[in-house]
Amino acid sequence: MNNSKLKQYVQLVQTANQNFNLTGLKTEGEIYEHLVQEIIELFNEYDSYFDHKKVADLGSGNGCPGVILKLLFPQIKTLDLIDSKHKKVNFLKEVIQTLELNNTQALCARIENHTEQYDTLCSRGLGSIIEVNAFALKLLKPNGIIFHIKQSLDQYLEFEDSEQKDQFKPLFFKFFHGKRQQILIAMKKNV
């Protein structure tokens, strides 16, 4: 993993955050801890879900987790950073260019209108598990994987009581206990 590129990413987020709202985090230390370190800790052992895969970060915003995943797993075949806000997409394009992220693009699109199909999807802070899974049904290839990053299991319990439980099989949970709890929830599309 390229630590100098991670540092550059943190600096890019902090600088852009002074001009428009990318995150509530202000210092480089906070940005590193909550955007970079958490993602590395949550995903570091799951390279097989990204190796030579077509990946999308839904509601990418400041590029977390997509940019960090591309730096952690440079062997990702293609990465689409998708957001509906032009300012954020322009920021993501700057990040892609500055960090020289190959086979990565930032797309200004509404997820419900996007038609590409992916092996792996990631979502952090976009919506509830049920809402994002509704998009994932269309965007994931058969047997594709979606990773949700949440702060509690409440939304997972709602998923368990929904009609979607037949469409997605939970694979695993991974907990990260830093200053705030983060939970990685991996699900496989059954359809």
Swiss-Prot record:
S-adenosyl-L-methionine binds at residues 59, 111-112, 124. One of its GO terms (molecular function) is rRNA (guanine-N7-)-methyltransferase activity. Its main location: cytoplasm. It comes from the Bacteria. Keywords: Cytoplasm, Methyltransferase, rRNA processing, S-adenosyl-L-methionine, Transferase. One of its GO terms (cellular component) is cytosol. It is an enzyme of class 2 (transferase). Its EC number is 2.1.1.-. It is found in: Cytoplasm. Signal peptide: none annotated. PANTHER family: S-ADENOSYL-L-METHIONINE-DEPENDENT METHYLTRANSFERASES SUPERFAMILY PROTEIN. Belongs to the methyltransferase superfamily. RNA methyltransferase RsmG family. Specifically methylates the N7 position of a guanine in 16S rRNA. This is Ribosomal RNA small subunit methyltransferase G. The lineage of its organism: Bacteria, Bacillati, Mycoplasmatota, Mycoplasmoidales, Mycoplasmoidaceae. The gene is rsmG.
